[in-house]
Amino acid sequence: MKIKMGKMYKYFLKGEEPMKHLKYLLLLVMIISIVLSFSGCSFRFSSFDSLLRPPKLSGEYQGLQDSFEKLVDKDYSLSTPENGLYRSAFIVYDFDKDKSLEAIVFYTEKKKPDLVKFYYFESKDGAFTPVASYDGLGSSVDEVKIADLNRDGKFEIIIGWNLFSSKTNKAFAVYDISSGNLKLLSSFPYSYLDIIDVNGDGIDDIFAMSVDSSVSDHYTSAATAYTYDAKTSSLQVLSTVKTDGNISSYADITVEKVDDTRLIYVEAYKGENDMITEVIYWDDNINALVSPLFDVSTQTTTQTLRHMKLSCRDIDNDGFIEIPVSVDMNGSSIVDNSAPQTLLTASADNTVNQTKSLYYTKWVKFRDDKLRAVQYSVIDENGGYVLNIPSSWVGRITVLGNDGQWDFYRWESYDEKLGKLLFSINYYDKNDSTLKQKYKNTKLLASYSSTDYVYTITEDGEYFGVTDDILTSNFNTTVLGGKK
């Protein structure tokens, strides 16, 4: 079976017909092999040589695998890229733009199980012909990207290699195809990368984030742009800038053009639940990358810290990206679903849920090297909804919440105490008749999948300024995808 995705083709591996007397056993083996091939794991065919031959590529590309298997030892494993667009051990593409296909196949051999190798094939007269085999730089493949970095009209192949299964320590290699075979141009360490025209000259560059864990007392990190240098026929560092090194992994890179500036938003995790966004751009005045939110004195980026797994996005539908930032909400207390479900109280007969403080989420735009607030929200991660609130409510309301119900109270900041109940938001399974009866006197906020979200406003809430329109027009379940 062939699936077309743009210009790229991905292939599913399909098993041979099993013998009748091993019907059920072989069916189980085939299911396991398919699951493993999709999960980014290597699958060692020789373990099942006595039962069935290696699964075959289907259709016109079956000859590619036949040719490949004649070149390698019988005992081999296919190695599938773990991330990115290309998620098959067999990648077929017109890399050199000559209107005929080429292919690369990632694999490991029994004698060198910690080294991924790859074969390069060209297609001639409808058949794939092997060109050469190459040693990779790591124990598995992180991802594969393509880009015309040297402007010769042909794509270079960028392969990211994992070094001993580390989340941050990797190396990418750039291979040129113009001579008819693959030539290694350059390789550099990285933790996360993307293809971006960093300085706006019309030529793609490699933009990479890298964490250096060799420093004994703290990690350091940097954003680096690599560009092709015609004099040396290799990649050279265009510019590099320091970033927060106290991160556990990178999540995503997003590029936004504002006026004549390309803003690069780098999402990073700090531990299990905290995130930051680095904002990096090319400064034409100094011809270099800059990271204005990075605090040199503390070696951290704290201005975009939030205590939840939430990435930047266009929250107000104005066509531009906003960054979420956590702001303390005094007096708040909600059930902590990331903690153990219950704790024993002083009385052994009772148990209570662990709780945690809630935060307002401030959505900010990056303009003129500063962050400007454009929206405030209260976010229920477990309930899967976002409630945008007027900025005048910040510091004046707080939340007490259990699973399925959040109560919004007036916060008396002068006395630092809980005030009157203003409104409540509940959610429940719309197919549960008992709960539907319980909430029959509430008003509907939204329905998402099998969940109904409802609300009630108290007289004190109406006096405070809470209205039906404020709640219904600012309630959103699509950002988080509804109840978890």
What are these regions (language model features)?
Residues F38-T398, A446-Y448, G481-K484:
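Beta-propeller-forming repeat regions
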Residues Y455-K484:
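Surface-exposed amphipathic alpha-helical segments
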Residues S392-K440, L444-L445:
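Secretory pathway targeting signatures of secreted, lumenal, and periplasmic proteins
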Residues A268-Y269, S326-D328, Y409-E416, I457-E462:
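Secondary-structure transition/turn motif
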Residues M19-S46:
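Sec-dependent N-terminal signal peptides of Gram-positive bacterial secreted proteins and lipoproteins
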Residues M1-P18:
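Short, Lys/Arg-enriched N-terminal segments with co-localized hydrophobic residues
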Residues G331-I334, L435-V466:
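Extracytosolic low-complexity repeat regions of secreted or lipid-anchored proteins
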Residues I206, I264, L387, G404-S413, ...:
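Generic recognition of long tandem-repeat/solenoid scaffolds
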